[in-house]
Amino acid sequence: MSFWRRLFGGATKETLKPQRLDYLNEALALERQGDFEGALTSYRLALRDKPSDPRILQDIAIAYTKTGQYEEAIRFYRRALSLDPTLVGAHYGLAFRLKERGEHAEAVEHLRAFLARPPKGQDADRWVRHAEAALRELETVAPEQP
């Protein structure tokens, strides 16, 4: 439909359908550009459309990690895992956030869950080696004090 037709009333209700933005892809693009705050906004909008999508929750947790908001990251990793306990990326991310907080026993659980179902792909070996090294380190640390 041309600009002139729209301007002079040639458009009908059927021809002017609002288009839904793809907030998830927008968030991923913003994150690739390094705009993590913008990505978080778009992720929240995507979550509003799909509140039970564990991958969106995991992506939000990753963005929070990249902005240094570790407590929020932990909260979103936990929410993602409550919806999908097999989400290995969430186990990986949560394990390292917990390790940094000194919650070693729970970090070990999540590292083991990650390593039980390691991801496949070009970069996967790097993440698996990192998780294995962290697990070895945590298993040699003295148990947490109650």
Q: Where do the PLM segments sit?
A:
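Alpha-helical segment of the N-proximal tetratricopeptide repeat
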Residues: 16-52
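Conserved structural position within tetratricopeptide repeats
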Residues: 45-48, 78-82, 116
